[in-house]
Amino acid sequence: MSIDLKNNVAKSAIFQNTVEDFEAFTGQILSSNQLKEFDFSHLNVAIIGTDQETVTHLEKICQQAKFVTVFQITPHFILPHSQIGIHRLITHPLIAKNRRLFNNRVKSILALRFLETQVNETWLKRLLTPNTARSNKTFFKSDSYYTALQRANCKLQTWPIVKVTDTAIYSMDGTQRPVDIIIRTTP
């Protein structure tokens, strides 16, 4: 799908998370690495994409913000930050002897088990379950990510973004989310 611009150059009408996609937005746009010191009090926050910073700070953002919408198309593997279970597994004699056995497959199983124990709602669990067949798996660490996503003021939006206007984000399912600030992860 494309539209013609004035100078006959075709531009994709699909949201690509590039700087041009945010030109109409009048609010503030933050990079995910600017989250630590920012005050989100009484703001409608949109998080576009997922990285270690957004996973780590989502609970803090939810505590301060009026409403948080997390736009995430592809779910990732979330491991507990405390890693008590992982430490026990690593010190097991069979794993300690053959360190190479502790690879992405084992971490994937641990991440899926963590998801299973942390998320109660079946549909949300399905939306957050990553594809275990993917060859390049991304692992993030957080003890509170799943808890934050289940808060009353937080919504996981898995439909693709259609456009960003001056005060809102529209997704493909027709939902309009009013937004005061956008946290953008770099693709």
Each predicted region: which residue ranges?
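Feature captures the FAD/FMN-dependent oxidoreductase FAD-binding
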Residues: M1-S12, K137-T138, Y145-K155, K163-V164
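Extended hydrophobic/aromatic segments used for targeting, binding, or gating
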Residues: T26-I29, A168-Y170, G174-P187
